[in-house]
C-alpha cells in the first residue's frame, strides 16, 4: 500500500470539514513548512467545530499510512504547541 499524497489527503479533509461544519482548519508542522519526511505525521488545528469527536472519527477513516493529529485550538494549553501552530499555519479550510 502506498502513502497517500498530501494533496489527496487535504482534498478528503476539506470534504470532511464541510460535512462537520468546521469554521476553519489549518495544517501546521512539517507538512506546512515543507520539511515532512516519509515518517512524518500530519498535524491539523481546528477552529470552531460543534462536534470535535465526530470530526476526529471521520478524519481517522481516511486511508493513509500516515498518522493524523487534530487539535482543538481553544483547548490547547501547551505554549510550545501554540507557538508552533501560530508560526507556520497553512489554512486549508
Indicate where each model-derived feature is located:
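Catalytic core of pol beta-like nucleotidyltransferases
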Residues: 1-26, 32-38, 47-93
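Histidine- and aromatic-rich ligand-binding microenvironments
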Residues: 41
Amino acid at each position: 500500500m502506498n502513502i497517500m499524497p498530501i494533496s489527496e489527503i487535504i482534498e478528503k479533509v476539506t470534504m470532511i470539514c464541510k460535512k462537520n461544519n468546521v469554521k476553519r482548519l489549518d495544517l501546521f508542522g512539517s507538512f506546512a513548512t515543507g520539511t515532512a519526511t516519509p515518517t512524518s505525521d500530519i498535524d491539523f488545528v481546528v477552529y470552531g467545530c460543534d462536534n470535535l469527536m465526530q470530526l476526529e472519527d471521520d478524519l481517522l477513516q481516511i486511508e493513509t499510512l500516515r498518522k493524523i493529529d487534530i487539535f482543538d485550538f481553544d483547548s490547547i494549553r501547551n505554549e510550545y504547541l501554540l507557538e508552533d501552530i501560530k508560526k507556520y499555519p497553512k489554512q486549508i479550510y
